[in-house]
Each structure stands twice: as structure tokens, then as C-alpha cells.
Design a protein with these regions (language model features):
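Non-catalytic, polymerase-adjacent accessory regions of viral genome-replication enzymes
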Residues: 1-41
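Short acidic (Asp/Glu) and glycine-rich catalytic loops that position anionic groups and cofactors
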Residues: 24-31, 100-104, 133-134, 148-150, ...
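Conserved polymerase palm-domain catalytic core
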Residues: 52-67, 71, 103-269
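Conserved phosphate-binding loops in nucleotide/dinucleotide-binding enzymes
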Residues: 77-82, 285-286
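Electropositive, glycine- and tryptophan-enriched low-complexity nucleic-acid-binding patches
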Residues: 89-109
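A conserved non-catalytic segment of reverse transcriptases
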Residues: 174, 250-317, 321-324
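Non-catalytic, peripheral interaction segments enriched in hydrophobic/basic residues
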Residues: 315-361, 365-369
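Extended C-terminal regions of large enzymes
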Residues: 349, 354, 358-427
Length: 427
């Protein structure tokens, strides 16, 4: 057995991989073993599995097909490996990634240490503010499903040059998919959803990065989302024509020519962000794209549906989780006005929930009086009927169930949290 594979299978590396998989949680694979059961499974089976891997006898199980609806229609096909295979894949990634980092492009930002969507957006803003305001937005058609496996393994060999490890990686590519209709072979692609897939996608697309660098082009790439910034429309047309041809000819990947297009910053959507020119600062800045904002609002609307069961406290806990996650991702962008609007609408919807849960006029009168409303006004308001939105926008209800009251109940203010996180991005 090779030294590299021994390093992958070492106790320290596999323990770290096990902890990472447990921390990420996630659903089980085709064997129905869950993350919670993983420790017992490893204690019972790991010695045998390790020996099988050493002798090239281990056979990974097929991934479980899960289809996630896309916002614009269609589905994203994910392949969920078994939890044991996730641990092994994570062990491979932990050892091979440091070997890949020195050869990866400076302008590649996906699934790499100390890099993120935010760093990709920051770099794109630098290009825009240097005058590179024509954008070639490349769309690779079903990238993870269409990666040529032989070409990919050739690139892996160039980096690690280790037959035992390459054999194990190829087995994961060939493991197949289990769908409701039965087993399907995988002769193309690397299943999106496995721990290995992000690293393998970067290895494949590093060839594109090198070609773009050799041409002196300014680009940012996050996984298979790649944009190229140039100074003129003529340059953009030339780059789009030659690069799409190169991708199909040299990498054997499919380019979706209906979605690959030339655009300007104002119309660009990249990694969920939109872009605008700040007239005062006279520079390009970013903010959440309108589609991203709409999706966020819809999610909050779902969580504040008055027909959904659960206490106000439970609802607020779920709302806070969504607010923090969304704002942490988009905190680099400018969005004070949007945050203030969402705050106001969110508080109104929570007032409706509270009003409905009080149910009867006597309970509503009691609730308003407890929050400081005078007896007569509380009684008058409480007997207004069940026109929820109309009642909860009345001044006395707004003042009673105020921002401060909802904050004491635990609700995070979108605007306050955004201001806090955005300030950190400017440091």
C-alpha cells in the first residue's frame, strides 16, 4: 500500500474526518445508517473496511439521489453518499487538498481555505472599479453531471501520482446512483453532494483558470460559477466565443449557450449578489440581488404564516436562524433600506400571530392592558373583530407590541444585526 493512502487511512486523519462529518450532520445514504449511528458503525466495521481499501477490494455504495427544486424551475440533482463513505471521502480531501493548493489559481474562491463567496465578490468589485465593466457570464451545463471522468482522473494523477489513491477515487466516481426506479451507472460526472466533489471540481476547472490566466484575463470563479471582466463589448464577444469553444474542445464540458451571455454590472447576478454604481462615492458596490431578497421575504412569510402551529417563541427562534444566516452571507452588501422594510413587515406579521393567539376579545383586552394600553382603548380595540391586519396596524397595537417588546421576546432586528455585521466587513 502506498504512503499516501496510509496517510489517508491513519487514525488521526480518519478521526478528524469523522468529527467533520458528524459536525456537518446531514441525511443518511442508501444503507440508512445515520450520523448518530456512525460511531457504533465504525467501531464494528472500520478494521475490515480499512483492509479492503488497502487491498483495493473496497466497493463504495451508490449515492442516494435527491432532487432539489430550483427557484427558476427544474431540479438540482444531489447524490448523498452513505455516512461511512462520507468519512472516507473527507479523509481523502484532508490529505489531497494541501497538495492541490499550491497549483490552484489565485482567482478561484470556492471550497478553499480562507476563501469564500465574499472574497470572490470583493475581487469582482475591484475589476469593476478598475474599468472592466463588460462581463462574460459563463454557464456550464449540468457541470457536476457532465465531468469527463477519464480527463478528471488524468488531472488527479498529475497532482498525486499514486495508483492506490487514484483507484479509490475512481471507485467513488463509478459508484452509481440509487433512484426510486433503481440503480443507475455513473459513466460521467462527480455526484454533487459528496465530500470529494468540490475538490474534484476545482481540479477540473483549474485548467480553465490556467487558460484564462495565460490570456491575461481578469476573472473570478466560485466552483462552476465563473465571470470574466473586460473593458469593451468587442473584447467580451471575442472572449465569449473563444473561451466557450476552448472549454468544450479541451475540457470536454458542455457550455449552456442559452445562459452564457455578455452583460453589464447593473444586470449581473453573481453568487446571489447584484451590483450598482454609488453616485456619491463614484464606485461600484454590491447588494443582494432582487431575486435573493424576494426569496428571503418568502421564507420569512412562510415562517410567519398565522395558520402554522407553534408558539410565538418557537416561531421567533426559527425566524432568527434564517435572519442571521441570510445577513451573514450578504453582510458585505448595501441594504439598510431593505432591512428596515423587512423589519417593519415582519413585526406586523408577528403582531397578527399574537393577536390571533389571544383569540377572544377578553384575552385581547387583557393582553393590551398588560402591555400598557389604557382600559377603555384596550377594550375598544379588542372588540374590533378578526380583521387581523387592520387591527394590528392600529397605533395602540403597534405601540403595545412594539419593537422593544418583540426584542424582549427574542426577535432579532434585521437592520440592527445587518449594521453590526456590515461594520465588521468594512474593517
Amino acid at each position: 500500500m502506498s504512503e499516501l493512502l496510509e496517510k489517508i487511512l491513519s487514525n488521526d486523519n480518519m478521526n478528524a474526518a469523522y468529527k467533520r462529518v458528524c459536525a456537518n450532520k446531514g441525511a443518511g445514504g442508501v444503507d440508512d445508517v445515520t450520523v448518530e449511528q456512525l460511531g457504533d458503525y465504525i467501531r464494528e466495521n472500520w478494521n475490515g473496511i480499512r483492509e479492503q481499501i488497502r487491498h483495493r477490494e473496497y466497493k463504495p455504495q451508490p449515492v442516494r439521489r435527491v432532487e432539489i427544486p430550483k427557484p427558476n424551475g427544474g431540479v438540482r440533482k444531489l447524490g448523498i453518499p452513505t455516512v461511512m463513505d462520507r468519512v472516507i471521502q473527507q479523509g481523502i480531501v484532508q490529505v489531497i487538498s494541501p497538495m492541490c493548493e499550491p497549483i490552484f489559481s489565485e482567482w478561484s474562491y470556492g471550497f478553499r481555505p480562507n476563501r469564500s463567496c465574499e472574497t470572490a465578490i470583493r475581487q469582482l468589485l475591484i475589476y469593476l472599479n478598475e474599468g472592466y465593466e463588460w462581463i462574460v457570464d459563463i454557464d456550464l451545463e449540468k457541470f457536476f453531471d457532465n465531468v469527463p471522468q477519464d480527463r478528471l482522473m488524468s488531472l488527479v494523477h498529475d497532482i498525486i501520482n499514486d495508483g492506490d489513491t487514484e483507484s479509490l477515487i475512481r471507485k467513488y466516481l463509478k459508484a452509481g446512483v440509487m433512484t426510486p426506479q433503481g440503480y443507475e451507472e455513473t459513466r460521467l460526472g462527480t455526484p454533487q453532494g459528496g465530500n470529494l466533489s468540490p475538490l474534484l471540481s476545482n481540479i477540473m476547472l483549474n485548467e480553465l483558470d490556467k487558460e484564462l490566466e495565460a490570456r491575461g484575463l481578469r476573472f473570478t470563479r466560485y466552483a462552476d460559477d465563473c465571470v470574466i471582466a473586460v473593458r469593451s463589448e468587442a473584447s467580451a464577444k471575442r472572449v465569449m466565443r473563444t473561451i466557450t469553444d476552448w472549454i468544450q474542445r479541451k475540457l470536454g464540458l458542455k457550455v449552456n449557450m442559452t445562459k452564457t451571455h455578455i452583460t453589464r454590472p447593473l444586470k449581473l447576478k453573481y453568487l446571489g449578489f447584484g451590483f450598482y454604481k454609488d453616485s456619491k462615492a463614484k464606485e461600484w458596490k454590491c447588494r443582494p440581488h432582487q431575486d435573493s431578497v424576494k426569496k428571503f421575504k418568502n421564507r420569512l412569510k412562510e415562517l410567519t404564516c398565522r395558520k402554522m402551529p407553534g408558539t410565538v417563541t418557537d416561531k421567533i427562534a426559527k425566524i432568527n436562524q434564517v435572519i442571521r444566516g441570510w445577513i451573514n452571507y450578504y453582510a458585505l452588501g448595501s441594504m439598510k433600506t431593505v432591512m428596515a422594510e423587512i423589519d417593519a413587515h415582519l413585526r406586523t406579521r408577528l403582531r397578527v400571530i399574537i393577536w390571533k393567539q389571544w383569540k377572544v376579545p377578553k384575552k385581547r383586552q387583557w393582553g393590551l392592558q398588560k402591555l400598557g394600553v389604557g382600559k377603555d382603548l384596550a377594550r375598544l380595540t379588542a372588540y374590533c373583530g378578526d380583521r387581523y391586519y387592520w387591527v394590528t396596524t392600529k397605533t395602540c397595537v403597534v405601540r403595545a407590541i412594539s419593537k422593544e417588546v418583540l426584542s424582549k421576546a427574542g426577535l432579532v432586528s434585521c437592520l440592527d444585526y445587518y449594521n453590526e455585521r456590515h461594520a465588521l466587513k468594512l474593517c
